[in-house]
């Protein structure tokens, strides 16, 4: 399985909403003691067991090419993409296979390069008050209230990803789909 976290490279974007996929990959690398195996493929690639973790180092809009290259080189069938989702309130976690990109340029690029048939782990980041503020919103840091729960949300998402390694999407979705983190 190839598990991809979407985000933008560089320190300026490290803790922004758009980089929540990168944050999950960073945590999975630690939890799984994954080994860095390559900085090729326009990304940083890690491996644990028979699974791969990828952080594309292209900007978000071009991430599909890195995913395609790793998928083809290692002949990987199953791809999971972790991404921010404006249409879900902060702390909401949902799972989906296939479907549209919903205006998300990282998903659009992925769809163009590998098809739409991959698992999406949708992490809610909320949306800005005004539609015209989307770009600045996704590239901004989380609020203090959100930051207070962000690590817990990321850890919970990691548990869901780990469950996907040995369970069906339906089982994982029924157990780990949440609304408005933190759980009470």
UniProtKB/Swiss-Prot annotation:
GO cellular-component term (any): cytoplasm
PROSITE patterns: PEPT_TRNA_HYDROL_1, PEPT_TRNA_HYDROL_2
Annotated positions for site Stabilizes the basic form of H active site to accept a proton: 84
Catalysed transformations (reactions): an N-acyl-L-alpha-aminoacyl-tRNA + H2O = an N-acyl-L-amino acid + a tRNA + H(+)
SUPFAM superfamilies xrefs: Peptidyl-tRNA hydrolase-like
Residues the UniProt record annotates as site (Discriminates between blocked and unblocked aminoacyl-tRNA): 8
GO biological process: protein quality control for misfolded or incompletely synthesized proteins; rescue of stalled ribosome
Localization (cell): Cytoplasm
GO molecular function: peptidyl-tRNA hydrolase activity; tRNA binding
Record-linked CDD domains: PTH
EC primary class: hydrolase
Residues that hold tRNA according to the record: 13, 59, 61, 105
Active site: 18 (proton acceptor)
Function: Hydrolyzes ribosome-free peptidyl-tRNAs (with 1 or more amino acids incorporated), which drop off the ribosome during protein synthesis, or as a result of ribosome stalling. Catalyzes the release of premature peptidyl moieties from peptidyl-tRNA molecules trapped in stalled 50S ribosomal subunits, and thus maintains levels of free tRNAs and 50S ribosomes.
Protein name: Peptidyl-tRNA hydrolase
Organism encoding this protein: Sulfurimonas denitrificans (strain ATCC 33889 / DSM 1251) (Thiomicrospira denitrificans (strain ATCC 33889 / DSM 1251))
Lineage: Bacteria, Pseudomonadati, Campylobacterota, Epsilonproteobacteria, Campylobacterales
